[in-house]
Amino acid sequence: MRRAVAGGVLIAVALLNSACSSDGMGAAPTAVSTDPATTALAAAVDIRATGCRPAEVRGAGALIDGDHILTAAHVVAGADSITVRSASPDATAVTARVVAIDPLRDLALLDVERGELTELRPLHVAAGAVGAGGDTGSVVLFRDGAAVGVPYSIGRRVVVNILDIHHEHEVSRPGYEVDIAIAAGDSGAVMVAANRRAIGVLYAKSRAVDTRAFASDTGAVDALVAAASAVDPAVGIDTGECV
């Protein structure tokens, strides 16, 4: 496991031994559940990235409106190859490319080929820090390749002073202190609230409390979506150096 400590939080990613359009994956059925546990599972993906270490880096993410996969930037920064797969037990991995990245907020968007991951159902992105202390919802974490829905509770809204993902500049990152136990490989998991709303992205475990984590809010996602609109999803972008 690789860890980086900054601003009182512990960023952890797992190192594993190596062994978008309306007619694409975002086409929603006429009736869908709005329960957070159900909608989180229907949008979740397991992410594997290679190229920065001898072993894979593992993370999580979720499909959002616009057929983009939302995740944490430090999971995919510098990667030569990225694959994603849905939470379905029989799902196969497909290639993904980074189309937008924000190293300050620790957020990234991925795209896959049109027609892939058609089983996913997108989440709506909430603007800004819409959650409040006591709010609850669900995230999907992957354990030994299996998707597990885990409830969360927001402890409070926070602005964390932390280094960017490349440890070059201190930034103020708005988001949430979240009551949830996470482990290596959970970075990028998307917090899902009622009515299919994505409200945050987990990026770090608390150093002080095992059952506490930190998440960026989704206030910067609209800007990432706008940036991605100018990118060829078949090519992607340069994601910078490994972290």
Tell what function each PLM region has.
Residues 28-33, 44-66, 72, 92-95, ...:
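A conserved glycine-rich beta-strand in the N-terminal activation segment of trypsin-fold
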Residues 1-9:
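Bacterial N-terminal signal peptides that target proteins for export
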Residues 21-23:
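Bacterial signal peptide processing site
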Residues 35, 98-100, 179-182:
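Short Gly/Pro-enriched turn/cap motifs at secondary-structure boundaries
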Residues 63-65, 98-100, 141, 156-158, ...:
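A residue-level detector for short acidic-glycine micro-motifs
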Residues 16-19:
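C-terminal motif of bacterial Sec signal peptides marking the signal peptidase cleavage site
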Residues 39-50, 113-121, 148-242:
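Active-site region of chymotrypsin-like
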Residues 67-149:
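Conserved active-site neighborhood of the chymotrypsin/trypsin-like protease fold
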